[in-house]
């Protein structure tokens, strides 16, 4: 027996296996194409996450510096009062690449910008600290979105590679072996029928 479930006997089996091989070849082609696209996307998200991490690190250091300045000039109470005034809002836009959903856009609602009225109330160092923390928060969320996209694409890339190997290393060879056995069996049957007709 050939080990391929559902295969009809005889010439119909040869046709059936030929169709299955064509499907397997097309599946391997599509999976290979998906691997190439996902690999490019993974490289792109790797670069984006590295850049966003550097931006986040720089922005966090800047925010820390302004926090220290604001605390020294206006005290912790002024810093807390300024941050409670306008909470930030966040929205994520999603995109699908080759069947993989991942964060694509980060939208912000910071509330009103620090103005001269707040500068008079809290002091310019506090207003600068609040603005620096907004930038750092935005950079952190952008980095988190880039990392989430990278993880989603990398996970799908690994699954797709596994599927491609299953098709090319197991499914196609099994079908080719079965087709070779069917052809050999049909040739033997035709020879036996030819010998029987000659007698």
Language-model features: where?
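Charge-rich amphipathic alpha-helical interaction elements
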Residues: 1-199
